[in-house]
Amino acid sequence: MANSINYAAVFNRILDEKFYVLPRTMWMEDSTPGIIWEGGREVKIPKLGMDGLGNMSGYKAPQGDLTLEWETKTLQWYRGRNFSIGRYDVDETNFALTVGNALNVFLREKVVPEIDCLRIAAAAQGAVAYGQVIAQASADITTANILGLLLADIAKVQDKIGEQEQLYIQISTGLKNLLEQSTQITRYLNVKDFQVRSATLRLEAINDQYLIGTPSGYMHSVFGLNDGVTGGQTVGGVTFANLGPNINWIIAARPAVDAIARPQISKVITPDENQEGEFWKIMFSVYHGNWVMENKGDGLLVNLDTASADDLTVSTEAGASAGASTVTVTGVLPEGYMYVWKATSGSAPNVTIGGTLAATDSWAELPADGKITTTNGYGISVAIFAKSNRKAIAYVKGTVSAGT
């Protein structure tokens, strides 16, 4: 009898070897010890709480509480793709080699970039919700000031969590290039080892904090996902949605951002077994998600470009009566965010990225249909903010210019 090869096991070994070292966001993976994941879309994360010191009474210390709670998180993304290879396009002797090479390319060019994009955007959104936000026009960052700006942001994080925590700096490649041209940078740069499972990587560091150059195309605060099926989305992957500002850099202590990804080749069907036709069928899927821990938010800072949200649009049309111009807002919301709006008789209200938009200051939630009525000539601002703390991540301003 011929030997039976478990191709799924062969390809999953390739995944284990490659998947966790390729991402630029590998430092986020499994950063919290004790996470429980038993398959499915939910994970349980331990949260430890304890009281501080109190005064001794004689030889007796005051009683304190030590609590261990489990917070349930949902893996936001369940993605996959099936591939087919004709029986006669490859013979069985080199099938594993051919698919193994294709899998490497697929991981490097399709899977890992998507995961990096989504993790970076989620970290930026988490910083708006729980961490620190610095608004800085990218156009104003130069070789003369970038080192000072970056060191100042590192200090802001260390001022909250101390200098003993290792920091990770996710920076766009363009800005990293500017940083390397700084006249004083050689005083601060070094190289450090970083352990990813069984692999040891050599990463650059600034002031002993990891510095990870990342393609600028990944450094956006909002992305859309193609479903791989609908017309115009069959190519799959992510699409850039300019609903939020671009990211200059993210600075994080590892406990502040956590990510889990579980890729797998779930099944390989041979041509002899395949009921659909004479071809090999390979089924790939990945559960993944990441989140910012609210109680660790002090260890996270995002430096955002101050550009407004170009893909957030506001249109106006005449209403049925005076003071009833119809305003329609369109855009796609990130998970955990909502629209608010405010109109005044003067200029459009100011919005600060990372600033709080209070309901007591007349900021109102946008209706589900995206339509509101207000007065022609009024200035109007529409913002996207985090439900958790009402901090703005994006906005658009304009004037109601139609109606009676």
Task: Locate predicted features.
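Extended, compositionally biased alpha-helical segments that mediate assembly or anchoring
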Residues: 233-236, 240, 254-308
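Surface-exposed, short loops/turns at beta-strand junctions within beta-sandwich domains
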Residues: 363-378
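Acidic, Ser/Thr
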Residues: 327-336
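Long, contiguous amphipathic alpha-helices that act as assembly "spine/axial" helices in icosahedral shell
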Residues: 45, 70-132, 149, 159-173, ...
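N-terminal "assembly arms/tails" that initiate or stabilize quaternary assembly
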Residues: 1-76, 298-303
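Extended, solvent-exposed, turn-rich assembly/linker loops in the middle of proteins
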Residues: 129-200
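Extracellular fibronectin type III
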Residues: 389-403
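Extracellular recognition modules
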Residues: 379-385
